[in-house]
């Protein structure tokens, strides 16, 4: 087996509140890639990308990538990345984002993770005002993952569950019926429902403060 090549670069493809996506170039020989986070191995395989999950918000991590063959392990290349401090929602995609291939115009694993983070966050937020929302978002998407029919249905059911609670109090946009041929406008609608849900919760909390005089601290804002 050949001596492992040294990778030339590792690229940050994106980050959310709890996940980081990384990519690198394939070598010219058969080898595996070993990825370390802060000195501990988190992934090893032949793929040239990886999404690391279960991270803390607003935290900086150092990733090091090496190449491995039976002859040994190469020197590593490193990159640092900081996770988002809050859930980020995108509601301003345009047709140009799609046609020009911009990041906002592509719906990928990190979008599924971001939305899942928001759904989990909103479930907790609704519970603070006594409202139960039955959701269970998937948060461990990888870059090559294509949602199965069941996963796509569950993804939209979580959005519809939040929308259902929202419609008891105010109007909002409709959720798409399917992820097949999802348009940029429908992608915006999904995250508008999440943003409107947060606005509703804030309004309930403010009303409760006004009528009861109780002070509720630590209201977290979705950007």
What are these regions (language model features)?
Residues 30-58, 70-77:
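Recognizes extended acidic, P/S/T-rich segments that occur
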Residues 84-223:
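Extracellular "spike/adhesin" assembly and maturation modules
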Residues 10, 40-42, 51, 102, ...:
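Short, flexible active-site loop motifs that bind/organize anionic cofactors or intermediates
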Residues 1-29, 57, 69-91:
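Pro/Thr/Ser/Gly-rich low-complexity, intrinsically disordered linker/stalk tracts
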